Amino acid sequence: LVFLPGWDEISKLRDSLNADYNVSRSASVLPLHSMVSPADQRKVFQRPPKGMRKIVLSTNIAETAVTIDDVVFVIDSGRLKEKSYDAYSAVSTLQAAWISQASAKQRRGRAGRVRPGECYRLYSTSRYNSFAEYQLPEMQRSPLEELCLQVRVLAESGAGVVDVGPGSTAGFLSRAVEPPVAQATDNAVQLLKDIGALTPEEGLTRLGRHLGELPLHPRV
């Protein structure tokens, strides 16, 4: 099981391995990514024929979301593709970044589930020690328009799910265990007002109620 940042790295390594005669005749190279069809994704869980190795090239989805129980060796690049958001420029980016120590431990734990295994990390101990203990929560590295809209929808649903009150979306989110940057919340609320989803007092408009029912970013 090889952990790589994203589809570009997976496809390049797959092509390189398949182009090597010694590898292609003795191993089946299988990518695990949302770009791969469900039928091909299921192949990573099948045992390889006798005399053949199975090489799975995956993103961090194989850390916890799926379990391939016959993995013996793990190769960890130490990288992932992570969405980040600059609250002050209101710009989102998806870029390669170093994983956290928690992710490194999860990746190591994928090896040796059915027999003794090994994990090869393609980074030094000093690099590992520089990793954050955990990845930043998604709420701290994503635009918050969808979340703020859902907060208002739940607050005005009458179901008592959340107690927000008028004009206090930022205050509600600030009580989260790991709250977002205040500027990010302010940006999100302002955008929802600008597109007519919220009133100046942060109440839901008719448009806001309709947008809250759609599985789309409000701006779309």
PLM segments and residue spans:
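P-loop NTPase motor module signature
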Residues: 1-219
